[in-house]
Amino acid sequence: MLQRSAPSTIPNTLARRIFMQRQGLLAPPTPKQTKADLQRLIEQLGFVQIDSIATVERAHHMTLFARNQTYQRRHLTDLLENDRALFENWTHDASMIPTAFYPYWQRHFQRHAEHLRTRWQKIRREGFDAMLDDVLGHIERDGPVMSRSFARDEKKGS
């Protein structure tokens, strides 16, 4: 018979310190954050939630700035759009996730594919399958693209 050991405990101060370190909030200030530094930070975090509302500033910029005050937006844009070191998907909300983690997301994509297709068919109604086929055909022909590579004449929310 297996013996159960008592659960490990650590003091609250150590638990807080571990949490803060894993969230990138204990690192000393650096002279200047490079694009590679930013990529390592996002990999450490696992993802950065995207916020499209900018009351003061979009939250993902504030999240990254809080971890390094030399954060530069252009590095995030480069990582996402030019280097393709990040991809957008839903964690619990829209997020930027390191492309290095993409293989770990494959099972999630497969598990939810049919549910998402059915949901989008209900939302988009007539023409959804043809639109999806067009998008997939475009990607097969031209490789990975951003959403802005597609029609701009469609109203948002339609």
Short names for language-model regions:
Residues 2-158:
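Phosphate-backbone binding and catalysis cores of DNA-processing enzymes
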